[in-house]
Amino acid sequence: MVETFSFAHLAYLVFESVLQVVIIALAGFWSASSGLLPKQSQKIISLLNVDLFTPCLIFSKLAKSLSMAKIFEIAIIPIFFGLTTGISFISGKIMSRILDLDKDETNFVVANSVFGNSNSLPVSLTLSLAYTLPNLTWDQIPNDNRDNVASRGILYLLIFQQIGQMLRWSWGYNKLMKWSGENTQHMPPSQVQSLLERTPNIDNEELVNEEQEEQELLEEENNRMNSSFLSSSSIGDKIWQKSCTVFERIRANLNPPLYSMIFAVVVAAIGPLQRELFMEDGFINNTFAEAVTQLGSVSIPLILVVLGSNLYPSAEVFPKTVHHSKLLIGSIIGRMILPSCFLLPIIAIAVKYINVSILDDPIFLVVGFLLTVSPPAIQLTQITQLNEFFEAEMADILFWGYAVLSLPVSIIVVSGAIYVLQWANPT
């Protein structure tokens, strides 16, 4: 049975959880402002967290509570990712059209709209809310508890995060957050110079490409004539090379958190190993499992400290473009406001009327609502720095998204999620 609470009471509970997260992030902001945590140290701590502490958190939470039945149920998450990405893309395009932005500015607003934070802030809030909010246990799981709720929330976020990260560093890095060269007005001098250096070579490259095409046609003709003499060993070599290429591409997209999730799935699939690690009060449980759990407990505070330190203004001043305010407004509305107008009703109706897979899990509803309104990903700062792409605008967007809007928006949205849960399950 779902216990009913007033909106004011729910808002107060959410406020407590969000404020806890904000206070830890403020510690990181203070550390950066006092010089205790300079940029280089932030990068080292962030790397240590991603490669060590976060994988331990993922393994300790998932391997303990996962089962094969749950693993099959999460197939809906890529569908949810596609839906949210599509609507966010449309939202970014709408804002760009309203604000009359050019191609590069439009790509920037679209990138900020599409690539929301699914790592630091949502993970911290989900863990905090899992132990604070009422009615988050799932009636389909016998003896469900808050530890299991937190574990499932992390699992949903992790899958969303991994898909988003691959998209950010492919489509985002190579297309959306890179100068097209169509309008050099906004481009920094170094990028303009690079564009000018590339331009004279275009005609030569076309001539070279034509010669290469002719050569390739001749080679193809020769290959056809000699195809009957192709040995089985050469076919085997080609298959082996193809397999190695595919394996390398897969390995390039793997990272420590993803490895950790894979190991957690393996442990969950082997019942005796899972019991020995987490349920039997034996040597392995009291040593290895406890050590991993303690390492994982460091992850969330470190994530928030680094998040807070990243929000401290850099000593380096980047020039603002002519449409600085337009880009700021378009990115914030396109990321945190406009998509929620479409997505939140869709999620609410799906939870009410489609009792399929994890749609019935209360923590999935909370995670879905949080992801819909989460600020732009901190990782976008790295991409804009690498491509020298609207760096001043990116810094201001992150400040407004995290320091100003995250607290009130999170309170309203999570309180709304619990209200939707009460509406969807009145008895």
UniProtKB/Swiss-Prot annotation:
Matching InterPro entries? Mem_transp_PIN-like
Query: GO annotations under biological process?
Result: transmembrane transport
According to the record, the segments passing through the membrane are: 10-30, 43-63, 71-91, 253-273, 288-308, 327-347, 358-378, 397-417
- Which of the residues bear the PTM Phosphoserine? 234
Q: State the superkingdom.
A: Eukaryota
Q: Tell me which Pfam families the record gives.
A: Mem_trans
Q: Where is this gene product found?
A: Membrane
Question: What keywords were assigned to this record?
Answer: Membrane, Phosphoprotein, Transmembrane, Transmembrane helix, Transport
Q: Name one GO cellular component term.
A: endoplasmic reticulum
Q: What is its main location?
A: membrane
The record describes its membrane topology as: Multi-pass membrane protein
Annotated positions of the Phosphothreonine modification: 199
Note from the entry: Present with 6440 molecules/cell in log phase SD medium.
Task: Give the family from UniProt.
Answer: Belongs to the auxin efflux carrier (TC 2.A.69) family.
Looking up PANTHER family in the UniProt record yields: AUXIN EFFLUX TRANSPORTER FAMILY PROTEIN (EUROFUNG)
Q: What is this protein called?
A: Uncharacterized transporter YBR287W
Q: What is the phylogenetic placement of the source species in the record?
A: Eukaryota, Fungi, Dikarya, Ascomycota, Saccharomycotina
